[in-house]
Amino acid sequence: MAKKEVAKKTVTVEQIGSPIRRPAVQRQTLVGLGLNKMHRVRTLEDTPAVRGMIRAVQHLVRVVDEK
C-alpha cells in the first residue's frame, strides 16, 4: 500500500519592519526566515522552531496566512 501524504501546515510571513538599528540577533533571525528586505513574503513550514523565530521578531514581521 502507498503511504498517505500528510499535508504539512504552512505559515506565510511578510517583513514589515526594518532591521536597521536592531540587535544583530534580530537581523540574523530575519535572514533565517528568508526575510532580509522590506515587504518580502515567504511561505514556511509551520514548526515550533519557525514559530519561535517569528515570535522573536514579531515587531518586524506580519503573519499573512496560516494553512
Curated annotation (Swiss-Prot):
Presence of keyword Oxidoreductase: no
Pfam families (UniProt xref): Ribosomal_L30
One function term, GO molecular function aspect: structural constituent of ribosome
GO biological process, one term: translation
Keywords for this protein: Ribonucleoprotein, Ribosomal protein
Keyword Ribonucleoprotein included in the entry's annotation: yes
Signal sequence residues: none
Cellular component terms (Gene Ontology): cytosolic large ribosomal subunit
Family: Belongs to the universal ribosomal protein uL30 family.
Subunit structure of this chain's protein: Part of the 50S ribosomal subunit.
Protein name: Large ribosomal subunit protein uL30
Protein source organism: Rhizobium meliloti (strain 1021) (Ensifer meliloti)
Organism placement in taxonomy: Bacteria, Pseudomonadati, Pseudomonadota, Alphaproteobacteria, Hyphomicrobiales
Name of encoding gene: rpmD
